[in-house]
A protein has these predicted regions:
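Structured non-transmembrane domains adjacent to transmembrane bundles in polytopic membrane proteins
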Residues: 46-66, 75-165, 386-585, 668, ...
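Membrane-embedded transmembrane helical bundles of large multi-pass transporters/channels
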Residues: 1-37, 100, 130-389, 507-509, ...
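Membrane-proximal amphipathic alpha-helices
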Residues: 42-43
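Conserved nucleotide-binding/hydrolysis micro-motifs of P-loop NTPases
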Residues: 74-76, 198-199
């Protein structure tokens, strides 16, 4: 296959480039519509009890409250004649909106729970209709119309899940724009520093642009057939920019290395495709395999990242394999055009490089050099011992976000906790007596302060008349029960209450479904934790198989998996220290809270995949030299000498694209950017620079061990580099800073 790719590039270079330009333009046009199709949310399991409860409420009762309008009277209390007149006019207008249902307010119920403690603010509750796509559009339109000042007499601010989702969607776009403004110029500067040539520096960016536009087109197509999270665009941008540049860097470096040996342009391209091209293809396979594990999770937030990640990796690799070679053919020696003032040719041999010297130093005393590094990484991982998990809420938004401010006001200025109430829905008729008995038992559970049913209100076992909104709790073929608690939403106690409610014996012949934000958290934890063993198993198994096919050894995959696990736990430990314990909260401007579970899973797959990316970069050259007859120690020294600077440069470039998202205002996107970028640097420096040579030295010849039958299997089906390259090939011409 690689021979055909090389020959196609050599014989039809300009035709391939024309096709690539046309395809890129088409992908750009298709991808431009992606943003309007993508959705917020996606953290719930569609098959979970809480999601089914919400769906049943939507179907039978007009929907749960997902929009809270906080209305403030400008001239005093909201129950003055003037304020009441304007308030009722606002509610009447809202009830005419076809996109709203179940509009309830203080002015038409006189419910004390909808009036602030000082009487200056009141709540209007409503449900925004529609599937996730339409609901998001409806919420945006409604907020445009009602958020702000009403009749010059009332101030209206929006909160609730619909408003939080709207604010998140807006923030995602703003964060992406800022990250791109930071990452692209910094990346170009680093590329100029690495290559010392304007032309060579621009080529990897071309691959990155193709990868990003292609992945946006992929997301646009996917959004037509399934729900796709809007935050997937951030992953495609970071991965597309980073991997496109990484793969381009690897191809260009090998091409320049071959030109430096005196090879013709055509032979240099052939050799580049056969060696670096194979490495790119294999590296992309390992990264894609890790990201594909996200597809086992039912939450579309995670599945979106799986689709987006696999797609952008495939497009980046395909661009490097099919677009970069014809570019190199057309440019030839002009790839070094536009030399920067600081650039000078590096003619030093591999043995003289800093990475070769580091490898030799480590391998002289492998245990002595590895143990301190390992100790530091394990200390970094120690915060994982206290990790707790949660799901995103308004606290992931910046403090000045309106929906977050509304939530804070509700908690501070209003009595009760109605917006966080557990919602119990029964999809069949229930007689009054068993319904009352069930509600009475619910009201006596620890943490419950009030239970609302269609027939009465229950407080600690005492029944009183039904509340103003009780009519909406009953349907001919269903009942709805609201359990209001005194507990902090998403706290351990609130989650325990969910378990207590579900454990309670329901009315005979009924099967209640329990929903609400606390139930959603419990279900999300259960759903994700239930799939984690499968995801980890798939990642480990596919990685082991791919690395065995590449190396012919069963020891090398185990060594790689162990070292990647160290990178992973160190990174997650540091993220726990920062985002859960809040040590950098003042600097980064986020609110410390439990680790977002979906993002933690996402980081596991990304960190694992990117660690394998650099594992392949380094191992491919070590194996190449070992296959040429060098012993393990010599192959490691010379392999790191050849790849050390390339891996370091690639890591810095990829880290920049992720660190740029550390400027995000959404805290879980900050964690995504900082965590992924940090993991890349840990892996490229501490793991590849110290622990890999130390482990290889300690393993010695056994590093390449495989049972006889597997060696036979590998000789027939394994992957390997093509014909060996000249042993004395000098380093590529790159700039030394």
């Amino acid at each position: 296959m690689f021979e055909r790719i090389a020959e196609l590039a050599i014989r039809r270079a300009r035709l391939v480039l024309i096709v690539a330009v046309v395809a890129t333009a088409l992908m750009g046009a298709l991808g431009s519509g992606a943003f309007t199709k993508l959705l917020g949310g996606g953290f719930d399991d569609p098959a979970s009890q809480s999601t089914r409860a919400r769906d049943l409420i939507d179907k039978k009762f007009g929907g749960e409250t997902n929009l809270v309008l906080l209305v403030r009277a400008g001239d005093g209390r909201v129950d003055t004649p003037s304020a009441e007149q304007n308030g009722k006019a606002l509610v009447a207008s809202l009830k005419k909106e076809k996109t709203l249902a179940n509009v309830v307010s203080y002015w038409d119920t006189r419910s004390a729970q909808l009036l602030s403690k000082d009487g200056r603010e009141a709540m209007v509750l409503a449900h925004v209709k529609g599937d996730p796509t339409q609901q998001q559009k409806n919420a945006t339109s409604l907020l445009d119309d009602y958020d702000g000042t009403y009749n010059k007499a009332l101030t209206v601010r929006a909160g609730g899940l619909a408003a939080v989702g709207n604010d998140m969607s807006t923030q995602v776009v703003e964060d992406l724009e800022l990250a791109e403004l930071i990452a692209i110029p910094l990346t170009l500067i680093l590329l100029l520093f690495v290559f010392g040539s304007v032309v060579a520096a621009l080529l990897p960016l071309a691959i990155a642009v193709i990868a990003i536009l292609g992945s946006f087109a992929e997301l646009s197509l996917l959004a037509d057939v399934t729900s796709v999270s809007n935050t997937a665009t951030n992953l495609t941008t970071a991965l597309g920019l980073g991997l496109g540049i990484d793969y381009g860097l690897l191809m260009i470096s090998r091409f320049r290395e071959q030109l430096a040996t005196g090879a013709s342009v055509e032979d240099a391209v052939r050799r580049t495709v056969h060696t670096a091209g194979r490495t790119v293809a294999f590296s992309a396979s390992t990264v894609a395999a890790a990201l594909a594990a996200l597809l086992v999770f039912p939450q579309y937030f995670l599945r979106s990242f799986g689709f987006a990640g696999v797609g952008v990796v495939a497009i980046a690799a395909a661009s490097a394999l099919f677009v970069m070679p014809p570019l190199l053919v057309v440019l030839g020696h002009r790839v070094n055009k536009g030399q920067m003032p600081w650039a000078k040719t590096a003619n030093a041999t591999t043995r003289a490089s800093i990475w070769a010297r580091l490898a030799r130093t480590v391998m002289r005393r492998p245990a002595l050099t590895a143990l301190p590094v390992l100790a530091v990484l394990l200390v970094a991982a120690s915060p994982l011992l206290g990790i707790t998990f949660g799901t995103p809420d308004e606290r992931v938004l910046p403090k000045d976000a309106e929906s977050r401010q509304v939530s804070a006001t509700l908690q501070k200025n209003f009595n009760g906790n109605d917006n966080a109430a557990l919602q119990i829905v029964i999809g069949q008729n229930v007689d009054e007596a068993p319904l009352g008995k069930y509600a009475d038992q619910l009201s006596q559970l620890k943490g419950a302060v009030r239970v609302e049913t269609s027939t009465g209100t229950y407080t600690h076992g005492q029944e009183s008349a039904a509340g103003p909104g009780s009519a909406n709790l009953s349907r001919p073929n269903g009942q709805r029960i609201s359990v209001v608690s005194s507990l902090t939403p998403k706290s351990d106690a609130a989650q325990s209450l969910v378990g207590d409610v579900r454990a309670l014996t329901p009315p005979p012949g009924t099967h209640p479904l329990v929903g609400g934000i606390d139930a959603e958290l419990v279900d999300a934890k259960h759903s994700i934790s239930g799939q984690i063993p499968l995801a980890i198993g798939l990642v480990v198994l596919t990685t082991f198989i791919l690395l065995f096919l590449f190396t012919g050894s069963i020891v090398q995959p185990l060594r790689a998996l162990a070292l990647n696990a160290i990178t992973l736990v160190a990174t997650l430990g540091i993220m726990t220290w920062i985002f859960q314990e809040g040590h950098l909260s003042p600097l980064l401007g986020f609110t410390a809270q439990p680790m977002e579970m979906s993002m933690t899973v996402l980081m596991f797959c990304i960190v694992f995949g990117l660690s394998m990316d650099y594992e392949v970069f380094v191992t491919s050259r070590i194996k190449e030299l070992h296959d040429q007859g060098e012993d393990t120690e010599s192959a490691v020294t010379n392999g790191l000498g050849h790849t050390g600077r390339i891996v370091t440069a690639a890591a810095c470039l990829l880290a920049v694209s992720f660190f740029a998202f550390g400027t995000a205002k959404l805290s879980f996107m900050q964690m995504f950017g900082l965590g992924s970028g940090l993991a890349i640097l840990i892996d490229a420096v501490a793991i590849r620079g110290v622990l890999v040579p130390a482990a290889m030295r300690l393993l010695g010849g056994s590093a390449w061990y495989a049972p006889g039958f597997l060696r036979t299997f590998h000789s027939r089906f394994g992957l390997s580099e093509s014909a060996p390259e000249p042993a004395a090939a000098p380093e590529p011409a790159v700039s030394r800073g």
